[in-house]
Amino acid sequence: MPVEYSFSPSELDYKAKKCPRCFYIHKHHKINPGDRPPPVFSSFDAVQKPYFKTTNTKTWCDDLPDGEIMDSSELPGKIVSEGLVDNKQRKFKLAGNPDIVIKFKDGNFGIVDFKTTIISLDKAENYRYQLEAYAQIFSSPGSTKTAKTPKLNPITHMGILQFYPDEITNHTDHNCDFKMKTSYSALNRNKEGFYDYITKLIDLLEQTIVPKFSDDCNFCNFTQEQINLLEKENEK
């Protein structure tokens, strides 16, 4: 029976690009380096979303039209794709939890991710495969055991809403008023580039030999040094 590969949108721009060897081992052996971001970023996210859910997306920036964030009654917590194949007709599935999905008043849809990060105009380029992956899920939706993913089409806007600490304006002995700069980085859809990338990832995973250590990967360097030290110990 042909293998159906499974990818999380969030791993496509991080684990997959960071190190081919670590990604290969992670997907085949379920071993994760454990390099998760500090919990404080989740805390920022938990504060940002409730506020922005009450706002019109047009107020976020000039690039977004009138719209509102879709809530849990319209979207399941986890969304999945169905029937996707790469450029070599190999089956794969996408499954994940989108940050922000927007329904615009003109009937179109948008996908936005909130990031507390150093602001840059092209920040969304760092997340281009993640954002397009969510667009592909909504274009070819599937179902989990508990919920069906809705088909949302067309998805006309994708991007990253960036937050960066700016200043503290007031404080008491238990809290403070904290301002953050914001900036929206838009991303154009690129379906062809996405499928080219997925095809390369599946090519990697179908290799029978584990990829070589990456010189620019800290985990590879750490593991390689451990091996070197062990070999020296065995020579004694």
Predicted regions and their residues:
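Short aromatic-enriched loop/helix-cap "lid" or pocket-rim segments at secondary-structure transitions
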Residues: 63-65, 170-174, 232-233
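Hydrophobic/aromatic-lined pockets within catalytic cores
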Residues: 29, 119, 139-143, 206, ...
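Short catalytic/ligand-binding loop motif for oxyanion handling, primarily in non-cytosolic enzymes
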Residues: 24-25, 32-33, 119-121, 166-170, ...
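Mg2+/Mn2+-dependent nuclease catalytic core
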Residues: 82-196
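Metal-dependent nuclease catalytic cores that hydrolyze phosphodiester bonds in DNA/RNA
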Residues: 1-108
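Hydrophobic, Leu/Ile/Phe/Ala-enriched alpha-helical segments that form helix-helix packing faces
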Residues: 55-60, 138, 142, 201, ...
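Short, solvent-exposed polar/charged micro-motifs at secondary-structure junctions
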Residues: 72-81, 168-172, 228-229
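Accessory terminal regions of nucleic-acid processing enzymes
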Residues: 18-22, 152, 188-236
